[in-house]
Amino acid sequence: MADRRRRLRPGTLAPVREGVNCRSRCFTKHKNGLKFPTSLHSRQLVFPRKGLDDFRKGCPPCTGLVTQVPVEGFLPQIYHRAPQLAPKKRQIKLLKEADVLSKLSPAQQARKAFLEDVEAHLTPHPLALYLNLEEAMPIELLSKVLEVLDPDRKLEDTWAYCQDTRKGMKEPTKLLKKHSTQVYLGPSKKTSVSNAGQWLYEEKPHKMDLLHENGPRPGLHENGISDIDEEFILKQFDIDYETKPSHDALHTMKLNQVPLELKRSVGLSKLQETEFFQKLGYERKLQKPQNPYKPKWVKMRYGAWYLNPKLWKKQRVDEPLVDPEVSHKAQEENFKKELQEQEELLADLHGTVAFKDFILSRGYRTPRFLENMYIGKECKRACNKTPIKRTQA
């Protein structure tokens, strides 16, 4: 035990002489050990030149394909300090002609451009559906619409129309001298057009002003006599039926807003009009608004207690209750009538006649359905031939 304790005591080891191999497993040396492979040496690796796999601007040039050794090492570099971030490179802006990140060859890009050009010529212009767009829109709004939808100015007529009208509006117009004693006919109407949250107003000339441009305006003479006659007043209320109908927009009107001339053409008098409108209002009050989400509730029944439950049938309560035996008999009669009608149609056909002649020529037994068919037909003919006896009164 004492010897064992001495061995386990900590002590200093003597230095090992040079050239002496240590028997410990941790320091064993292998004479035929594996050498470091040269393929993993970063200085001997060879890489292709940068930019050979970039096909964004087309195929790379065939010249200068010499490979070169990378400047940086293959193995990771260990920094004793925090590594500095590399400066960000500016993204190279490609030309408009070259598609961004496109993998197409120049021939494919040319074909794609040709197809887009053909489709652009074939597709109709967005303003081609609106024929009366010039008359319906004010000039300022029409010019803004054209700038958005037709930037290339393909619609030359509409652009010329806008420019001509703008020039006419800018030119000074001749104002008529208005006398203080002339009749005032009211301000001009304003038509509002909503566009992108803004209201644009276009002042349209009044119909009465257009009438006075052609003829003299009524006024007072020096004697105090006015030119306003009965004919002049009737002309003001005259309706022009030769105006262009606007098919683009549908103007809905209520029954109260219908003009008197249309009511007279229909033939409604004043009393009939009041009764008609009163009936409409009363009917609307009686009609309750139906909720489409709630289905209509219908009461159903399946039969009576005194009938056989096997013969019950689902039906509504308001429908009359029919005896199932009677309904069964009626169905049988209807079925027999349909069969008779079909037999009559088949008996007149050429196929059935030829089939009957074939059976008789061969001496076969005629089937029962053919016999019944022709028996019924002969009975019908006999009934039609027999004269009806008239009883003398």
Curated annotation (Swiss-Prot):
- Please name the GO terms of the biological process aspect recorded for this protein, alphabetically: protein localization to chromatin; transcription initiation-coupled chromatin remodeling
Record's keyword terms, sorted? Chromatin regulator, Chromosome, Coiled coil, Cytoplasm, Nucleus
Subcellular locations according to the entry: Nucleus; Chromosome; Cytoplasm
Q: Which organism is it from?
A: Homo sapiens (Human)
Q: Name one Pfam family in it.
A: FAM47
Write one Gene Ontology MF term. enzyme activator activity
Q: Where are the transmembrane segments?
A: none
- UniProt key word Coiled coil: yes
Q: How does it assemble?
A: Interacts with PRMT5; the interaction is direct. Interacts with WDR77.
Which protein, by its recorded name, is this? Protein FAM47E
- Its domain of life reads Eukaryota
Which parts form a coiled-coil structure per UniProt? 326-354
Predominant location = nucleus
Role this protein plays: Promotes histone methylation by localizing the arginine methyltransferase PRMT5 to chromatin.
What is the similarity comment for this entry? Belongs to the FAM47 family.
**Gene Ontology CC annotations of this record:** chromatin; cytoplasm; nucleus
InterPro entries on file:
FAM47
Tell me the leader sequence span: none
